[in-house]
């Protein structure tokens, strides 16, 4: 009996010993479902870079791994049975020699469960040696592998997880979708009583046409009145449109009234007649992000109609802008592109430009169009090179109020200038074409808002105002991805000192609603949280707000994003003080704040991380003391705060926008 018991004990001990020395299973990263990777460009490469080339980092080749493109993210369910993850990370050598790649940096990070950071590479650029990853995963259930862009160009961010491998005992690591979100409309319905919205500051040059529509919500019918209207201007009591011209420079304070059966709303409008226009950032629509080359007179008119029928006009949205592709293709014979007197001709999709602007103006809005300083536009259509005066006159004669001027083919002209004798400086070459068109626009008896589109070259924010720009693109083109939108928006810190009434940094158009850059549209790829971040951040940045979606297909969520008057008031505040970053934390949270004309602070609490996180703003960081009143601007309700700070939980890629005041 004792021998049998001893044998059983020995067998158990041997089994226990063998189990303790069992080798964990191994799973290469390439074996998980890589379709779950969300990345800004291309598809993940299996044992290849995102460009399909053998993986190489810092001159060292790797046989296996995953090639991706920042920004990218992969969620995994480890089930608590994983033990280790190892890899080598870095920027792939396949972007060597690309000028934009030289300025691009990426950062790899791995977080788990309660937003705990397990690995962070720090910024890496092409040519850097691969950095090893070796992390303990015992007890970890959810793992997120992230590659972020760190400044520089948004292109050529080829990032590799080389030789990535998990060890585990139990269930295999499984790639999963990122957590879903509900598209919750936070904006309360506008009250039935009258409320005047939009800008309270309007700039116009002496003797130039005035067109200002009182933006007001509330039940219709509604009538409008105004006190102290300047000589030369009249108000239509039915439409609320102020039109005419003011001869004498100066500042005029007009008292506006909007009345319906439930009451009257009053508000002051300051009209400044002088050299400055665009005294608060422009708000409107642009055709490119939804229609691109498919734009037409019919679609522009439909956008104007939708601006009215949706009620956006009642919240201060003003401009209806057609982008590229209204002209004749630049490869056509000269006589087909321009009339004998030099004025530019339109293609058959735009039969009558004057009739189109008249239509837009009749609805109380302003009209915009597009050109380039080079021989052809980005889309390959006729542009303004050597016809700047003729084109500016034509735009004014047609009745346009806005010009987007896109660098495009001028790069070819610039290269020829550089090769000539005694070439100007690089900065002078960048400035020259914008100065030429700026002078031409000033010669017109009409205010035409001048929007530079040259992607931030030469630090345009430092000189754009000096040569007549009302706004200037500060980065490359945006697209409807988190990496693009967040990479552009959160890179604006430091530019705030160059912005103000009449001259604004422009981080590009809004990518909410249905977009697509052509006839085939899709709902934005931004999640609901990301869209709230997008609008909140652009308003804090005093960015021009140009809707890029098909206005005829707006859903309630998109409409809610674009009609919150307390949020839009941050953007349209007459002080014109762009927000700056106040704090930036290792967990991906940031706080941005801007001064408001009433002495308050507009504050954005952002979470760029992959998991919910608490975000705090201290009154000391805002330069204020004592108890503060805090208002949630999206929900339009007051919230409680501590005596010296405010803290809230912000979801993945989300935002919480507040106003802090005494």
What are these regions (language model features)?
Residues 24-187:
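Gly-Asp-aromatic-enriched flexible segments
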Residues 194-219:
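Solvent-exposed, low-complexity, repeat-rich "mucin-like" stalks and linkers
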Residues 214, 250-262:
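A short beta-strand micro-motif common to beta-rich folds, especially ectodomain repeats
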Residues 232-248:
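Strand-loop-strand motifs at the edges of beta-sheets in extracellular beta-sandwich domains
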Residues 289, 303, 307-422:
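Aromatic-lined carbohydrate-binding/catalytic grooves of carbohydrate-active enzymes
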Residues 390, 442-550, 571:
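Glycan-recognition surfaces
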Residues 532, 538-541, 546-548, 584-624:
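Carbohydrate-binding surface patches
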Residues 641-662:
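C-terminal beta-strand-rich structural cap/linker in extracellular carbohydrate-active enzymes
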């Amino acid at each position: 009996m004792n021998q049998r018991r001893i044998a059983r004990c020995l067998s158990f001990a041997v089994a226990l010993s063998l189990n303790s020395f069992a080798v964990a299973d191994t799973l290469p990263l390439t074996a998980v479902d890589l379709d779950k990777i969300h990345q800004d460009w291309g598809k993940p490469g299996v044992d290849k870079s995102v460009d399909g080339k053998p993986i190489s980092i810092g001159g060292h080749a790797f046989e296996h791994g995953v090639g991706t493109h920042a920004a990218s993210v992969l969620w995994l369910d480890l089930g608590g049975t994983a033990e280790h993850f190892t890899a080598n990370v870095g920027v792939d050598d396949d972007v060597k020699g690309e000028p934009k790649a030289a300025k691009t940096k990426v950062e790899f990070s791995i977080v788990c469960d309660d937003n705990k950071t397990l690995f962070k590479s720090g910024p890496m650029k092409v040519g850097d040696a691969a950095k090893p990853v070796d992390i303990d995963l015992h007890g970890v259930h959810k793992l997120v592998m992230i590659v972020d862009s760190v400044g520089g160009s948004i292109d050529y961010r080829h990032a590799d997880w080389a030789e990535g491998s998990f060890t585990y005992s139990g269930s295999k690591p499984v790639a999963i979708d990122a957590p879903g979100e509900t598209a919750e409309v936070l904006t309360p319905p506008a009250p039935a009583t009258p409320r005047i919205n939009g800008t309270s500051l309007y700039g116009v040059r002496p003797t130039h046409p005035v067109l200002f529509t009182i933006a007001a919500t509330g039940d219709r019918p509604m009538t409008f009145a105004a006190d102290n209207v300047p000589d030369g201007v009249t108000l239509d009591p039915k439409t609320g449109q102020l039109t005419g011209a003011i001869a004498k420079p100066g500042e005029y304070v007009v008292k506006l009234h909007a009345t319906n059966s439930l009451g009257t709303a009053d508000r002051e409008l300051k009209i400044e007649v002088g050299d400055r226009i665009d005294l608060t950032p422009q708000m409107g629509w642009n055709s490119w992000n939804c229609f691109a080359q498919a734009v037409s007179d019919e679609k522009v008119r439909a956008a104007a109609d939708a601006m009215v029928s949706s009620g956006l006009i009642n919240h201060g949205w003003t401009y209806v802008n057609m982008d590229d592709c209204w002209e004749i293709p630049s490869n056509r014979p000269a006589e087909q592109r321009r009339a004998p007197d030099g004025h530019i001709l339109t293609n058959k999709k735009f039969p009558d430009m004057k009739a189109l602007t008249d239509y837009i103006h009749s609805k109380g809005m302003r009209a915009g169009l597009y050109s380039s300083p080079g021989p052809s536009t980005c889309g390959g259509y006729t542009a303004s090179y050597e016809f700047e005066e003729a084109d500016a006159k034509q735009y004014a004669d047609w009745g346009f109020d806005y010009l987007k001027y896109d660098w495009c083919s001028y790069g070819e002209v610039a290269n020829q200038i550089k090769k000539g004798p005694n070439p100007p400086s690089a900065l002078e070459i960048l400035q020259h074409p914008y100065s030429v068109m700026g002078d031409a626009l000033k010669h017109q008896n009409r205010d035409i808002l001048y929007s530079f589109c040259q992607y931030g070259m030469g630090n345009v924010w430092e000189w754009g105002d000096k040569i007549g720009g009302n706004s200037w693109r500060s980065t490359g083109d945006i697209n409807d991805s988190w990496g693009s939108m967040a990479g552009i928006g959160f890179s604006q810190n430091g530019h705030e000192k160059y912005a103000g009434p009449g001259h604004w940094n422009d981080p590009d158009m809004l990518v909410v609603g249905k977009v697509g850059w052509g006839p085939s549209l899709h709902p934005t790829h931004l999640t609901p949280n990301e869209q709230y971040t997008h609008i909140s951040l652009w308003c804090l940045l005093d960015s021009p707000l140009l809707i890029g979606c098909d206005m005829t297909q707006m859903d309630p969520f998109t409409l809610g994003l674009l009609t919150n008057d307390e949020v839009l008031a941050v953007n349209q505040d007459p002080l014109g003080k762009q927000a700056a970053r106040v704090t930036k934390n290792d967990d991906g949270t940031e706080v941005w704040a801007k001064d408001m004309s009433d002495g308050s602070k507009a504050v954005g609490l952002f979470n760029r991380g992959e998991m919910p996180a608490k975000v705090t703003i201290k009154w000391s960081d805002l330069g204020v003391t004592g108890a503060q009143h805090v208002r949630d601007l999206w929900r339009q309700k007051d919230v409680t705060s501590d005596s010296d700070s405010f803290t809230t939980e912000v979801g993945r890629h989300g935002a919480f926008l507040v106003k802090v005041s005494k």
